[in-house]
Amino acid sequence: MTYLFVAAGGALGSTLRYWLSGLIAGAIGQSFPWGTLVINISGSIVIGAFATLTGPDGRVFIPGDWRQFFMVGVCGGYTTFSSFSLQTLTLAQEGQGLWAAANVVLSVVFCLIGVWLGHVGAVLINEGV
């Protein structure tokens, strides 16, 4: 049953990623993979908060299947490491090494900050602050 939950969550997350990437590309342009960057940062914030809120010390109880639905399915389908990797390679192959390096640095730094912010926010919620 967990596999069905994960598959359904993945379908939702992937659809949301596709929609939001298109929205961002239409608004900002496609010279840099801003959509992927925004998605990976926001996905990191969300999974950091959700994992902490629903973890052993969390304030919110979520049954295991539903936790997997959201964390593995929705967040896994929403975030885009393979897309990030391909877009970085494409930038490098097109002679845009500085943009490729910026994509790596910005993605890693801000996704780590995002997951930390999500975690800290959830810890505060768990503590009733």
From Swiss-Prot:
Binding site for Na(+): 76, 79
Organism: Rhodospirillum rubrum (strain ATCC 11170 / ATH 1.1.1 / DSM 467 / LMG 4362 / NCIMB 8255 / S1)
Gene from which this protein is expressed: fluC
HAMAP family: FluC (MF_00454)
Keywords of the record: Cell inner membrane, Cell membrane, Ion channel, Ion transport, Membrane, Metal-binding, Sodium, Transmembrane, Transmembrane helix, Transport
Name recorded for this polypeptide: Fluoride-specific ion channel FluC
Transmembrane residue ranges: 4-24, 32-52, 69-89, 105-125
Task of the protein: Fluoride-specific ion channel. Important for reducing fluoride concentration in the cell, thus reducing its toxicity.
Cellular localization per UniProt: Cell inner membrane
GO CC terms, sorted: plasma membrane
Pfam families: CRCB
InterPro entries per UniProt: FluC
GO biological process: cellular detoxification of fluoride
